[in-house]
Amino acid sequence: MHINMISAISNQGKLHFLLYSDAIDSDRLISFMNAIIKTAAGRRVYLILDNLKVHHSNKVSAWAKEHETQIRLFHLPPYCPEYNPDEYLNNDLKRNLGTQAMVKTVQELEENATEVLNQFSADTEHVKSNFDHPKLKPYKLD
């Protein structure tokens, strides 16, 4: 039993997430990035992506080019999750879910994950702390 998540965090403590059951595709990623742009209040978004195949798709690349004044995509080197602050959020989510009672359905798992993520979202200092990992210190922006 599993769910998938796409998420983005900011060094200002903002968290955006989307839970889903099937595979990520270009359309879902583009929809997620559009939602992030809408919440940025006219500021340009700088989004760090890992090397998932969909992150490099022609459709996503073309969309990013069309929206380059609103969003800029950066790709991490391959096999370097330690440089992605969002990975620390994912690990924290898994730890929190692991302490809860065993779920019986995917719906219960999704509800629990949503509850934990909403708690994280309400705690901007907690979200910001994902940028405090020693591997990220040289890149931390205040």
Regions found by a protein language model. Name each.
Residues 49-60, 78-83:
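Acidic, metal-coordinating catalytic cores used for nucleic-acid/nucleotide bond scission
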Residues 65-85, 102:
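RNase H-like polynucleotidyl transferase catalytic core
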Residues 86-142:
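C-terminal anion-handling pockets and recognition modules
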